[in-house]
């Protein structure tokens, strides 16, 4: 379906307004909501295209600027070494509590909209995969998709590099989908095994999917992009969202 991608909101948080971009079907109606958390580069072209694709399948998609208190509104970091260095510096400058507050604010923004059914999911990529994992600890989140989520295995998200994401994994009550590239140096085999073992330990409802891909294999810019793998994994994501958000999970 065709979409609208021109809606911008400044969502209130205790650390200042969080610029948030909304993508939605053009047709009037009520739709499930999805928060898309970006990579360390913020709301880039590839992130916008991912949001548009999800919206075109019948969802309201909110994309917040993850570094809104550290970067000017509208700032996009380049896919180069300088951009990566700045994005990683920001990742470790921001307080863990601020990441969590931002997630709650983005979810609340969707839920209060008249065009939202109130059924909510999250998806994230790289840094955003970890943010989606933490956002799923909110009881309103029925489904979460984490693409090669960084820092979960090492517990190093946020200022001080000491998060409690694995410790709190048992708080996630919705359905999880974790997607990994086996050639991703940011989350090696040992790290992936640590995450999976913890999810098994807390009896999480999750699907685990590993592919022969590099870090950033779904980003449709650069030499690591693998279109075949990307579309395959997007299919898994949409299947989860359709079952849990659009059609409704009878268990919830």
What residue spans do the PLM features occupy?
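N-terminal cap/leader regions of alpha/beta-hydrolase-fold enzymes
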Residues: 1-252
């Amino acid at each position: 379906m065709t979409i609208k991608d021109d809606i911008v909101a400044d969502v209130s948080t205790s650390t200042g307004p969080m610029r948030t971009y909304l993508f939605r079907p053009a047709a009037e109606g009520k739709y499930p909501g999805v928060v898309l958390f970006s990579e360390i580069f913020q709301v880039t072209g590839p992130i916008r295209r991912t949001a548009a694709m999800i919206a075109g399948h019948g969802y309201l998609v909110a994309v917040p600027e993850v570094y809104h208190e550290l970067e000017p509104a509208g700032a996009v970091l380049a896919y180069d070494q300088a951009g990566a260095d700045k994005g990683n510096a920001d990742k470790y400058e921001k307080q863990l509590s601020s990441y969590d507050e931002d997630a709650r604010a983005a979810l609340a923004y969707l839920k209060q909209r008249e065009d939202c059914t109130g059924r909510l999911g999250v998806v994230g990529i790289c840094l955003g995969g970890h943010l989606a994992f933490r956002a799923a600890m909110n009881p309103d989140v029925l489904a979460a998709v984490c693409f090669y989520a960084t820092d979960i295995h090492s517990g190093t998200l946020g200022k001080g590099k000491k998060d409690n994401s694995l410790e709190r994994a048992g708080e996630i009550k919705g359905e999880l989908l974790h997607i990994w590239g086996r050639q991703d140096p940011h989350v090696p085999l040992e790290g992936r095994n640590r995450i999976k073992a913890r999810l098994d330990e807390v009896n999480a409802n999750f699907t685990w999917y590993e592919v022969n891909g590099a870090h950033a294999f779904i980003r449709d810019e650069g030499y690591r992009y693998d279109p075949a793998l990307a579309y395959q994994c997007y299919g898994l994501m949409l299947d989860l969202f359709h079952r849990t958000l659009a059609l409704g999970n009878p268990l919830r």
